[in-house]
From Swiss-Prot:
<dbReference type="InterPro" id="IPR012597">
    <property type="entry name" value="Pheromone"/>
</dbReference>
<keyword id="KW-0472">Membrane</keyword>
<keyword id="KW-0636">Prenylation</keyword>
<keyword id="KW-0488">Methylation</keyword>
<feature type="propeptide" description="Removed in mature form">
    <location>
        <begin position="74"/>
        <end position="76"/>
    </location>
</feature>
<feature type="lipid moiety-binding region" description="S-farnesyl cysteine">
    <location>
        <position position="73"/>
    </location>
</feature>
<dbReference type="Pfam" id="PF08015">
    <property type="entry name" value="Pheromone"/>
</dbReference>
<keyword id="KW-0449">Lipoprotein</keyword>
<feature type="modified residue" description="Cysteine methyl ester">
    <location>
        <position position="73"/>
    </location>
</feature>
<keyword id="KW-1003">Cell membrane</keyword>
<dbReference type="GO" id="GO:0000772">
    <property type="term" value="F:mating pheromone activity"/>
</dbReference>
<dbReference type="GO" id="GO:0005886">
    <property type="term" value="C:plasma membrane"/>
</dbReference>
<keyword id="KW-0588">Pheromone</keyword>
<protein>
    <recommendedName>
        <fullName>Mating-type pheromone BBP1(1)</fullName>
    </recommendedName>
</protein>
<comment type="function">
    <text>Activates B-regulated development.</text>
</comment>
Length: 76
């Protein structure tokens, strides 16, 4: 398990078929984002900024830009 998967396990469904459920309309995405709670990765002091950006870039590339990783990459 990589560090990004460990920080955001809900982005990596175990069951087949759930991947399509993660990519929905903007309202679906907004509702999911509003209800999600995350501890800030920065608050853990576990990863350097360069490490976090590398993790996000890998996740962005792997998922094709259709997940929360894309938003984190834009913010970063």
């Amino acid at each position: 398990m990589d560090a990004f998967t460990a920080m955001f396990p809900e982005l990596f469904p175990i069951e087949e078929g759930l991947e399509d459920a993660l990519v929905g309309s903007l309202s679906d995405t907004s509702a999911a984002s509003a209800s999600a709670t995350h501890t800030s990765p920065a608050s853990t002091d576990t990863f350097d900024d360069a490490d976090i950006l590398a993790i996000l870039a890998d996740a962005e590339h792997w998922r094709g830009g259709n997940t929360t990783a894309h938003g984190w990459c834009v913010v970063a």
